[in-house]
């Protein structure tokens, strides 16, 4: 029994070390875009900041794809139509800046603007009519009743989403319904990048 427990602890320790290495590698890859993000923000009148944009890049692609902010769909309606990181960041920052301005105008919290990056700008009006504060419950309802049906999921079909923040809340997402945990993941990744930047 003791040998089995020792083996399990060793495996867990190796897994944690490996995951820490992977996360650190991904953070460093994202941080390589910092000068590009700073330049783009300097050229725009925006309430977005460098750390927020970098956290969104980490959430979207971990810096591992040319379309680092997954801007293609909001830009052209097609996946992977943007093949240049600078263009991806420029479009992503423009969309985020637009969302932040709309959120301020509507009197909702800034995390609603971040969630709207995933759900679409109409989510800002939805939150304005439902308490002015983005929550997982509101995001879940919006995903199920608005986003998913608009993309063909009218039956409420779900799938399991393996992310720690999702697992805490049950771990399910609606097929074609966006990511109800998106703003929370970005928020979490802000701290993750800050922590990993120390090493």
Curated annotation (Swiss-Prot):
InterPro entries: CwlT-like_lysozyme (IPR047194), Lysozyme-like_dom_sf (IPR023346). Gene3D superfamilies: 1.10.530.10. GO terms for cellular component: cell surface. It comes from the Bacteria. It is found in: Cell surface. This is Pneumococcal vaccine antigen A homolog. The gene is pvaA.
